[in-house]
């Protein structure tokens, strides 16, 4: 991108979408490779037989012997796109009907077909440089066109270049540079340094602000398309705050420590109910996406803890984020790391942590009779919940800048068991009958925000309206966004929704009726 492109596209985006001048990235830095040039690691298609790496390029190929009868898509597996710039080189060969494209902010349908925004590529020159909505609204902007789509779907077209002149800059037989920028509701396409299409999409029903990246191999006569030097740069979210939700690997059994299912459920609720929030989930451990945190306003970690905590190999990386003001939150076992350097980091990030031989992790019924006045408690009524509520956390000295959010008095029986790293210890026994904090908010001296929450053992607890709302509120608060006066709205998830995405198969003796009765009791 650079001077010419920034001046043109910057003016287009600012004029059409009301962005501040600083919203468009002004530096080349920040692009990271997402294809290693050697393997298809991190890329996957339903039928991999058409895809390979040749001459350092991802290659999609159809032949007379192995034709493509329906469009094929190679999907990047390591993350999704929201606001971004993508740069790559492409080359296409075959007959004049050879066609391809780059899918962005798209979805994968059940049949493996990828639907959504497509930066078009073809050999004949009819579609190259256009923006198409695959399996959707069809052509959005032809080459040389700027399209504004109103909220009711009506379109206004303006010429931004001559299609033939723009086609003349495309190398029919050689490599071409494709540069795709998506910021807010706007998408801009550029080939070989020239803007070919601009779309500003205000159609809330049909537009997408996030989704997958995929490469297309079109059905038809034999052809080949190649992609190389694929680089991604995430942009600060336009009129949104972003929380990156890191889910740890599978852990206990069905319905417990369901990191993936829990975060996928809550992220869906945030994205559906908070237009100013973008929640992105990375499942099964620390993200392999090298750009995962580049435009994050907050990071929320739900995982097993101790020495196996997902952050243990990424302490310095996470600390750099915190020092930039990125919010940090840890949930359930995720509040525990080893004492020493890891524990000190959590004290810096969230104001407290589970320290072995100091804190304890019993299961008990916590009754939260009174809630403090805080954005995280907005719309939340006093409630009770049986959970593995860890307590007696190690907090920063004098609990400076820490606000207790959930406080209850544990049964004395939870303090008596043994003398070990997680059970009873003299420190907790000295506090018989005293209140303990099991969730807290932290306002860091650097301006960032932290949150710790020790509940979340049982996946079904997300069906408790007050339990769930408090956590949703916390995920918004740590981004720096304003929590609505009545908290984050969301519908009580159904049993089918709760059972989705779990790590383990459902046991034969699973009692759905018992869970449904608990949910009704929580929300009566």
Regions found by a protein language model. Name each.
Residues 7-20:
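Bacterial N-terminal signal peptides
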Residues 357-446:
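Catalytic beta-strand/loop cores that center a nucleophilic Ser/Cys/Thr
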Residues 1-6:
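Positively charged n-region of N-terminal signal peptides that target proteins for export
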Residues 65-66, 91-96, 108-110, 124-127, ...:
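Solvent-exposed loop/turn segments at secondary-structure junctions
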Residues 245-246, 251-337:
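Helical hinge/lid and interdomain linker segments adjacent to catalytic or ligand-binding clefts
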Residues 308-382:
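A glycine-rich, often tryptophan-bearing local segment used as a flexible ligand/cofactor-contacting loop or short
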Residues 238-240, 265, 283, 414, ...:
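Extracellular ligand-binding/catalytic regions of CAZymes and related secreted enzymes
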Residues 24-238, 346, 352-353, 360, ...:
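Carbohydrate-interacting regions of secretory-pathway proteins
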């Amino acid at each position: 991108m650079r001077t010419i492109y920034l001046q043109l596209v910057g003016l287009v985006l600012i004029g059409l979408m009301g962005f501040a001048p600083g919203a468009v990235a002004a530096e080349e830095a920040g692009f990271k490779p997402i294809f290693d040039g050697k393997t298809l690691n991190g890329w996957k298609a339903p039928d991999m037989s058409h895809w390979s790496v040749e001459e350092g390029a991802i290659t999609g190929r159809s032949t007379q012997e192995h034709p493509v009868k329906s469009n094929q898509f190679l999907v990047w597996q390591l993350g999704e796109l929201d606001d971004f710039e993508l740069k790559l080189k492409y080359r296409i060969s075959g007959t004049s009907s050879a066609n391809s494209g780059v899918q962005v902010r798209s979805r994968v349908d059940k049949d493996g077909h990828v639907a959504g925004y497509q930066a078009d590529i073809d050999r004949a020159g009819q579609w190259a440089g256009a923006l198409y909505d695959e399996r959707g609204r069809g052509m959005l902007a032809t080459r040389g066109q700027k399209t504004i789509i109103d909220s009711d779907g009506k379109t206004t077209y303006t010429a931004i270049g001559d299609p033939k002149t723009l086609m003349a800059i495309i190398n029919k037989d050689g490599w071409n540079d494709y540069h795709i920028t998506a910021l807010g509701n706007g998408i801009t396409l550029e080939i070989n340094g020239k803007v070919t299409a601009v779309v500003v999409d205000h159609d809330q029903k049909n537009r997408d602000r996030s989704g997958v990246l995929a490469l297309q191999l079109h059905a038809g006569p034999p052809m080949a398309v190649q992609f190389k030097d694929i680089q991604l740069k995430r942009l600060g979210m336009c009129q949104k705050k972003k929380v990156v939700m890191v889910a740890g690997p599978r852990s206990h059994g069905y319905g417990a420590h369901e990191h993936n299912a829990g975060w996928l459920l809550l992220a869906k609720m945030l994205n559906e109910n908070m237009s100013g929030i973008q929640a992105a989930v990375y499942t099964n451990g620390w993200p392999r996406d090298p750009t995962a945190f580049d435009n994050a306003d907050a990071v929320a970690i739900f995982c097993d803890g101790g020495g196996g905590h997902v952050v243990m190999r990424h302490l310095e990386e996470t600390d750099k984020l915190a020092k930039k003001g990125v919010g940090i939150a840890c949930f359930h076992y995720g509040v525990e790391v080893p004492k020493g350097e890891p524990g000190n980091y959590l004290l810096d990030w969230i104001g407290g942590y589970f320290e072995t031989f100091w804190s304890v992790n019993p299961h008990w019924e916590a009754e939260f009779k009174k809630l403090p006045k805080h954005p995280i408690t907005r719309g939340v009524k006093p409630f009770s919940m049986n959970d593995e509520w860890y307590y007696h956390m190690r907090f920063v000295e004098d609990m400076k800048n820490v606000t207790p959010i959930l406080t209850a008095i544990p049964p004395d029986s939870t303090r008596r068991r043994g003398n070990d790293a997680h059970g009873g210890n003299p420190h907790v026994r000295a506090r018989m009958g005293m209140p303990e904090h099991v969730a807290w908010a932290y306002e860091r001296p650097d301006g960032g925000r932290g949150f710790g929450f020790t509940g979340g053992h049982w996946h079904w607890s997300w069906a408790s309206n007050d339990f769930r709302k408090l956590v949703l509120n916390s995920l918004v608060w740590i981004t720096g966004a304003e929590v609505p006066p009545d908290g984050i709205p969301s519908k009580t998830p159904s049993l089918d929704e709760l059972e989705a995405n779990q790590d383990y198969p459902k046991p034969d003796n699973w009692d759905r009726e018992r869970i449904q009765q608990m949910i009704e009791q929580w929300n009566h």
